[in-house]
Amino acid sequence: MPIPILHCDRNSKELYSRFLQGAREDLTTATDRILPILESVRTQGDQALFSYTEMFDGIKLSQLTIDPKKIKTNVDEKTKEAFLRAKSNIEAFHMEQKRESWSKVIDGNRLGVKYTPIPSLAVYAPGGKALYPSSVLMGIIPAKIAGVPSIQLITPPQKDGIPEILVWLAQIMDIDRIVTVGGAQGIAAAAYGTESVPKSEFIVGPGNAYVAAAKSYLSGQGLIGIESPAGPSEVCIIADENANPKWIACDMLSQAEHGEDSSAILLTTDLTLAKRVSEELEIAFSERPKRLQMKQTAIYENSSILVFPTLDDCIWFSNELAPEHLEIQTKDYESVFAKIEHAGSVFLGPYSPVAMGDYISGTNHILPTARGSRIYSSLGVDTFLKRVTFQEVTKESLENLYPFVKLMSELEGLDEEHGTSVKVRTRQFQ
């Protein structure tokens, strides 16, 4: 059952029905299941967290938080070297995003912006097979650069304790505490706060449908901020006849490895390349059978190769799709990139697979999905900063601008108090 190869143009109805409806996860069922959990944590606090941890994780905890500085770790040196290299690159990239407060005189008044960090952050790290220590770096580093003063790591407990790599990362990133609670109850603890778990104003990090549902619901209630709403992982690849079909197949499968709901879409004008990529996918399935059923489901059911008449058509569709990850594997990839408007993160040229950004290059891998990059950006320093605008109006400027305030406030029917609050400061009133 090879991957579907579809011949398309801008008027193809299937493009809209199949690809442009948005692939955001339907969290209705998950939300229904987690609402009682959220309410229990809100009303019962620590007691609910102990109970749910024993129920879902099979672990009876004696405490809910630990100080990472008090735990000895034995992470091997090669692993440390890899994560320290990633940490260095991520820090260097995100340092370029730092903001400076500013002010400027406009029409006689000093106006400006003061940047202040959010007061607190929780970073969620899933447990078990879905352990993503790289996401811990991606969430914490830009927050640290932004100046967030309080950061806690939330992760489900394991039968043999918290994974050493997470503890070590918490140590080198100077995290306040590790909260040993996972799932929706862990998200609720961060949003509401309990006797042992301080409330956080913002939370980031990957998780299953129940974690996503809890984040979405609690954010909608105004209880905690989140990064862009999450959906299944996705990659879009724009490629021409110069691209390597084996490399493209590998890049598509690297997304399929995330889960059967992941998607990988190749956009090309070259039918020969399309067929060769399809063949390379089948070869890869036979050569690398690990997680075979999951990868095949993602490729056969959620992925496609789309053949368009022109490269501009491929670019147009990519902008409509607004993918989480976009690879551009064309001869003149810079000219293609110049026309890209919507993508979470872009990978330019044949030697820039998504996995480089996932781990080591330095860009952030916490990205908007399901066409979210049309309105959201990747996680960054700005995510954790607030803009406080200010103005200092001079006496002379107030005198000069009062007639305009008077006219505008009268027009809106608010002159009695709005207009008066300016008028009483003018010479004619005094």
Swiss-Prot record:
Its cofactor is Zn(2+). GO terms for biological process: L-histidine biosynthetic process. The keyword Zinc applies. It is an enzyme of class 1 (oxidoreductase). Its EC number is 1.1.1.23. Keywords: Amino-acid biosynthesis, Histidine biosynthesis, Metal-binding, NAD, Oxidoreductase, Zinc. One of its GO terms (cellular component) is cytosol. Substrate binds at S233, Q255, H258, H325, D358, E412, H418. InterPro entries: Ald_DH/histidinol_DH (IPR016161), Histidinol_DH_CS (IPR001692), Histidinol_DH_monofunct (IPR022695), Hstdl_DH (IPR012131). Binds 1 zinc ion per subunit. The active site is at E324, H325. Pathway: Amino-acid biosynthesis; L-histidine biosynthesis; L-histidine from 5-phospho-alpha-D-ribose 1-diphosphate: step 9/9. It catalyses: L-histidinol + 2 NAD(+) + H2O = L-histidine + 2 NADH + 3 H(+). Zn(2+) binds at Q255, H258, D358, H418. Belongs to the histidinol dehydrogenase family. This is Histidinol dehydrogenase. The lineage of its organism: Bacteria, Pseudomonadati, Spirochaetota, Spirochaetia, Leptospirales. The gene is hisD.
